[in-house]
Amino acid sequence: MLKKKRLIKILYGLVASVTALTALFFALAYGWLGIHDGPGVITEARIPEEIISKRELTQSNSRKKIGAKGAKQILFGDLHVHTTYSFDAFIGSLPMMHGEGSRPLGDACDFARFCSALDFWSINDHAEASTPRRWSETIESIQQCNAVGGHGNNPDTVAFLGWEWTQEGGTPDTHYGHKNVIFRDIETEKVP
């Protein structure tokens, strides 16, 4: 009798396991748990040369107006940019959080170029949420963003490759917090 009860428990466990695995298979196959949106599309146009020239002229005139000496240029940038590859940005972008939806890498490049007029920026999605696929897409997107921006002495924006590394410790001595890792190079063979 005891053996029979034990066999019934094992049988129930097997049926439950097979049912759970089947449900998981269908959930993954039909995208019920979400789908990978990919890196998005970067607009294949840089800021028109007239606009860049106008910005430079405005800066030069402003420099003269206040009597500043020298020709140094102030650059504006953002070295902490997240896309929805980062969990916190993903949650904040959900419509139920009053967000506007997915914000992929292509949107980050376009926003830096056309909306915020950044001279430079760095992608810094959370390293903990990265996968080999996402990292590869990140590298390709940053390379594309810079290719559109133009090479040489006057690109419309410069995109840097990087990630945000987070370490939380239980004491001040072991807590390092958030650190942005930013690479000088974007060539595939020069980055991890």
Range-by-range predicted roles:
Residues 10-192:
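Extended, charged catalytic domains and RNA/DNA-binding interfaces, predominantly
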Residues 1-9:
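N-terminal Lys/Arg-rich, disordered targeting/topogenic segments
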